[in-house]
Design a protein with these regions (language model features):
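Active-site donor-binding loop signature of nucleotide-sugar glycosyltransferases
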Residues: 18-20, 45, 106, 134
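PLP-dependent aminotransferase-like
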Residues: 1-43
Length: 180
């Protein structure tokens, strides 16, 4: 989706295919491909569709490189809430005070609100945020989506219950697949 969107702006897209030989991990060379101002590097953490968490050192190296050369690192954390150590792995705090790091997330995955289209961006880059506001719709969040988001955040036990259920399901699925 992001590569397609970039093509509308005639952007040059450099992809980093993941391979089984490298355990489907984002390569350490990722940061070295970030060359200068105007570059936008995108990482999905955890990776979709593998579900593998990106090595924090790879994300840190990419963020540092973006800060050095004036580029932008966008980290999609829409699936990160499923990880038990999501708070420790998130780069949202760094993004909040950086002009060169942004975090995308949404209620779509963890809260199962795909049809409500409720998401957010965290960045300390006021120019980026203003540009997104100007490009957006007059009413970007419906009242139904807003109410659902507030209700989801008020259920403070939901995330831990969901993680517990998924841990059990993951173990069951792994067992069943290994018995094939």
């Amino acid at each position: 989706e992001y590569a397609e969107a970039a093509s509308y702006y005639v952007a040059c897209v450099q992809e980093f295919p993941l391979s089984e030989a490298d355990d489907f991990d984002v390569p350490a060379s990722f940061a070295r491909a970030i060359e200068g101002p105007g570059d936008v590097a995108y990482i999905c953490n955890p990776n979709n569709p593998t579900g593998r968490l990106v090595d924090p050192r790879v994300i840190d190296a990419a963020a540092c490189r973006c800060e050095q050369v004036g580029a932008l690192l966008v980290v999609d954390e829409c699936f990160l809430g499923f990880a038990p150590d999501a708070r420790e792995r998130s780069v949202a705090a760094r993004a909040a005070c950086s002009r060169h790091v942004a975090v995308l997330s949404a209620f779509t995955k963890l809260y199962g609100m795909a049809g409500l289209r409720l998401g957010y961006l965290i960045s300390g880059n006021a120019q980026l945020l203003e540009g997104i506001r100007r490009a957006g719709q007059a009413w970007p969040v419906s009242s139904v989506a807003e109410a659902a988001g507030i209700a989801a955040l008020e259920d403070v036990e939901y995330v831990s219950r969901t993680r517990d259920v998924l841990a059990g399901e993951r173990a069951w699925l792994s067992h069943e697949l290994s018995s094939l």
